[in-house]
Amino acid sequence: MVAPHLWLRAETKPLEERSALTPRTAKILADAGFQITIERSSQRAFKDKEFERLGFPMVPEGSWRHAPKDAYIIGLKELPENDNSPLKHTHIQFAHCYKNQEGWREVLSRFPAGNGLLYDLEFLQDDNGRRVAAFGYHAGFAGSAISCLVWAHQLLHPNKQFPAIRPFPNEKSLVRHVARQVRLALKKNNNQYPRILVIGALGRCGTGACDLASKIGIPFDNILRWDINETKKGGPFTEITESDIFVNCIYLSMPIPKFCTVESLNVPNRKLRVVCDVSCDTTNPNNPIPIYNVNTTFDHPTVEVKGVTTPPPLEVISIDHLPTLLPRESSEAFSEALIPSLLALKDVDNAPVWVRAKKLYETMVQKL
């Protein structure tokens, strides 16, 4: 049996510092007989020298296009923009084209056009239907952190745009920074901590959002933990307007009643200042938070909700790669969880996780 060849491509999405493989997990695979090739990257949280030190061959950024046909091209976010050329390789990545997202046909059609194959990381599942690896915890953690920073900024710097934000070296430094800003803002809020409503609180993402809130000192009773039992009555929910911060952590798999609308938020005595849509189903027609229509970025983290004229200010965070706020820790956790599935590439035609992923790809291609 020929050892699988994994080719780690450099991410090209602006400010994306995460990596599908880390030096540690790449070595685990190499020790198991895999051939590993690493593209150089100026923005990856793990420096080139960390891979070089372990003896991995390094190749120029973007050279995956010329990789051997049998190499698996592994990455995280979308391929470079403004390129619709056919794809001849097998790609392992988050493609965001299986849930009717805007432009999904253009993204997906590149794979069959070049006789390539897509294994979408979002849909790698175990025998129980649970994702084998996900960034959910760190997405919720980061979304909650930025939400608290935006809340504090509104109180400390009224009428000033929330500034660009950059990744933190580790969780400890992020928690320390957010806690300090919230403490400063308390003086402008009658020493009252914000009330945070987390919907999807029982999942990995929601757990991360609640953990951040707890770690920065927000009292337990100020963190409303909602899940399916609380939302099954159907929205819009007045509890959202009565909270200072709303963090949406659900996994959207079917149409559901709206959690909130511009109309439901445009009411007197609204407390809500910040909405973080961690789920970020911006272009999904079933988005339960239809109060914005653009993805925000680390350079411009928030967007105002148009049509809401009552005070206080209301901003949405809709960054679609929140875990890169903690790129090293989130990458290590994700990559470690992915290792058993990657090891199964040695028997890719029979390993259930890959057989299911290929079948799903073929089903989606039939819809083109």
Swiss-Prot record:
The active site is at residues 77, 96. It catalyses: L-saccharopine + NAD(+) + H2O = L-lysine + 2-oxoglutarate + NADH + H(+). GO terms for molecular function: saccharopine dehydrogenase (NAD+, L-lysine-forming) activity; saccharopine dehydrogenase activity. Disulfide bonds join 205-249. Its EC number is 1.5.1.7. Transmembrane segments: none annotated. Monomer. Catalyzes the NAD(+)-dependent cleavage of saccharopine to L-lysine and 2-oxoglutarate, the final step in the alpha-aminoadipate (AAA) pathway for lysin biosynthesis. GO terms for biological process: lysine biosynthetic process via aminoadipic acid. GO terms for cellular component: cytoplasm. Belongs to the AlaDH/PNT family. L-saccharopine binds at residues 18, 77, 101, 131, 135, 279-281. The gene is lys3. It is an enzyme of class 1 (oxidoreductase). PANTHER family: SACCHAROPINE DEHYDROGENASE, SACCHAROPINE DEHYDROGENASE [NAD(+), L-LYSINE-FORMING]. NAD(+) binds at residues 130, 203-204, 227, 231, 251, 278, 319-322. InterPro entries: AASS (IPR051168), AlaDH/PNT_N (IPR007886), AlaDH/PNT_NAD(H)-bd (IPR007698), Lys1 (IPR027281), NAD(P)-bd_dom_sf (IPR036291). The modification Phosphoserine is found at residue 85. Keywords: Amino-acid biosynthesis, Disulfide bond, Lysine biosynthesis, NAD, Oxidoreductase, Phosphoprotein. Pathway: Amino-acid biosynthesis; L-lysine biosynthesis via AAA pathway; L-lysine from L-alpha-aminoadipate (fungal route): step 3/3. This is Saccharopine dehydrogenase [NAD(+), L-lysine-forming]. SUPFAM superfamilies: Formate/glycerate dehydrogenase catalytic domain-like (SSF52283), NAD(P)-binding Rossmann-fold domains (SSF51735).
